[in-house]
Amino acid sequence: MAEITKQDVIEYIEKMSVLELSELVKELEEKFGVSAAAPVAVAAAGPATADAAAAEEKTEFDVILKAAGANKINVIKVVRALTSLGLKEAKDLVDGAPGAVKTGVSKQEAEDAQKQLVEAGAEVEVK
């Protein structure tokens, strides 16, 4: 019997949709009692930390669908176009709002996605 390698797992995960990845993360968090959220920085560092954070410009953004709005069909179409998800996966993502439509994208790509989703009637947030 062939042994599954780390590379096999990585290749399998690469083929998963955004919705499937989200569900996988939730299941792993529950199974191992951990959180995938980034730890909150301690605020006791003082004003020097605030200056450093302001100087470092954010380069990766997440596009979060907060609500589908009244025109859900158009929002699903835009989500499919932006993510290459199938119809069912895109519908599940829209129905399960709030959820990430795109993660780790450039500022321009995030703004374009936000514009398209808002035009379709969705409520969107860029983080």
Curated annotation (Swiss-Prot):
Record InterPro entries: Ribosomal_bL12, Ribosomal_bL12_C, Ribosomal_bL12_C/ClpS-like, Ribosomal_bL12_oligo, Ribosomal_bL12_oligo_N_sf
> Could you mention a single GO BP entry for this protein?
translation
GO MF terms on file? Answer: mRNA binding; structural constituent of ribosome
Listed A to Z, the keywords are: Ribonucleoprotein, Ribosomal protein
**Superkingdom, taxonomy of origin:** Bacteria
Q: Name one Pfam family in it.
A: Ribosomal_L12_N
What Gene3D superfamilies has UniProt attached to this entry? 3.30.1390.10, Single helix bin (1.20.5.710)
GO CC aspect terms: cytosolic large ribosomal subunit
Q: Which family does it belong to?
A: Belongs to the bacterial ribosomal protein bL12 family.
Q: What does this protein do?
A: Forms part of the ribosomal stalk which helps the ribosome interact with GTP-bound translation factors. Is thus essential for accurate translation.
Subunit structure as annotated in this protein's UniProt entry: Homodimer. Part of the ribosomal stalk of the 50S ribosomal subunit. Forms a multimeric L10(L12)X complex, where L10 forms an elongated spine to which 2 to 4 L12 dimers bind in a sequential fashion. Binds GTP-bound translation factors.
Q: Which HAMAP family match?
A: Ribosomal_bL12
What name does the UniProt record give this protein? Large ribosomal subunit protein bL12
Q: What is the lineage of its organism?
A: Bacteria, Pseudomonadati, Thermodesulfobacteriota, Desulfuromonadia, Desulfuromonadales
